Amino acid sequence: MMNKKIFSLVFSMVFAATSASCLTACKDSGGLDAFPEYADDKQMMIGGWDSPMNTLEDYRMAKEMGLTHIFIDEYFAPKGSQDYKDILGFCEEVGLKAIVNMGASVDSEKPTDTTDYSIYPAVDMINYWDEPTIDRFELIKELANEHEARYKDKRDMTFYINMDPSGGGGDPDEYVRTFCEEIMPLVSGRKILSTDVYPLSGKNGAHSVSSAWLPRLELNAVYAKEFDMEQHFFVQSYWSNLTGTREIYSIDDLRYQFYVDMAYGVQNFSYFTYTHSFIEGFGGGCVEREVSCKKTALYDWAQEINAELAKFDHVYLSFDWNGTMPIVGTDNPDGENAHFMALKHSLTALECANKVTATQDTLVGQFKDADGNDGLIVTNYTDPLDLVDDVVSFEFKNANRALVYRGGERKIYEVKNGKLDIRLAPGEGVFVIPVKLK
C-alpha cells in the first residue's frame, strides 16, 4: 500500500497540474463569443437493485421511471430457467440494460455460473460480487481472468464489483487501491469503482447524516481519478431500524443524495432498492414486491429526479472532477462540521473564484471540461429534514455570466462585478458554469 505521505503527494501533483492548465484558461483572454454548448451524446447510468415481478409490464414500468439499468436477481426466477430468459427478453424489449447478479457477497464462495451472457442483447454488466472482504480478492482475480477470456473477443461486457464501504475487513485505502491496482487491470473495457453508503440515519423520530458518507465519497473520487475509472454509488431508497436508516419522507431526501455524490464526481447511480426488499424489516423501494405494477410513494419522486438529471447529464458528464471544497456555513452555531474535518483532500479555494461563502454547510465540487471551462456542483449539505435554505455567495475571478442548471433546466444569470448569490432549498443542488462573454 502507498503510504499516506506519498498518496497525498500524488493527489496534490494531480491537482497542481490541473490548476496550472486552469489558470491559463481562467485568465482574461477577452471572453467567449458564445456560451459553451455540449453534445447530447452522454448518459448517466441510473440503475435499480432488486428486480421487479417477472412480467413485461413491470419491466416497462421500471424503464418509465427513468432507469437505464436493472440488477437481475433470482428472487422470481432461477438462472437458466425459461422465466429468467424471459426477464432478459423483457429488458431488451423495453430498452433496459440488465446487470446479472452472480449472487456472491461479503465472504461467500466463488460463484460458479459460467454462462456466456453475451448471447442476451440486454445484458450489459456482470455483477460478480457484492461488498467482498479483502481476503476474497484472489478469487475475484480468478473471476476477472475468466471474464476477460470469455468476453474479450465478443461484445463489451462490463466486469462489475460493488465494494464494501467499510474496507472489506481491512484498511479502506489499501482495500480500494489493491482493487484498482491488482484486479481492474485484468479486464478490458469500461471500469467502474462502486460502493454504497446509506447516509440518511435515524429512528424513533431522531435523524442525522452518516459520518461515513463523505470520507468514502472522497476516497473513491481520488482513486477513480488516479486510475481513470468511472464512479458508481447507490442511493438510499429503503429504510430499516435494523440498519439505523430512516424513512425517505420526500423527494428532497433522494435529490440530496444525488447532488452530494455529484459534488465528488459520481457519474452513475442505482437505487437501493427499486423493488421493496425481500429482507425482513426493510421498508421502502419504488415498487411493491408481491403486487404487479404497484408503485410506492418513492416511484414518482425517483421518476422526477431521473428526468431532472437526464436533462443535463450530457453537460455534467462533459466535465472531470478536480476536487471538492466543503464550506462551513456562517449560520452554523458550532463554527465547524465534524464530517468535513474527517476529510483528507478537501480544497481550500476554488480556481475560478476569489471567494465563496455560504450560510449553511455546503459542498462545492470543482470540475473542468475539455476546453478549460469551469463547472461547479453546489449542494446544500444540511439534512433535508432540517428544512434550512442555504445562500451560497461567489466572487468569481473572470466571469460576467453564469449558466445554472437547476431542476435540470439551464438558466442564465448575470454576474455583476464577479458576484453571484444562489439560494438552495433543503436537499437542493445546482450545476454552475461561470462564463465571461465578450
Regions found by a protein language model. Give the residues of each.
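Bacterial N-terminal signal peptides
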Residues: 10-21
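Glycan-processing catalytic domains of CAZymes
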Residues: 30-401, 405-438
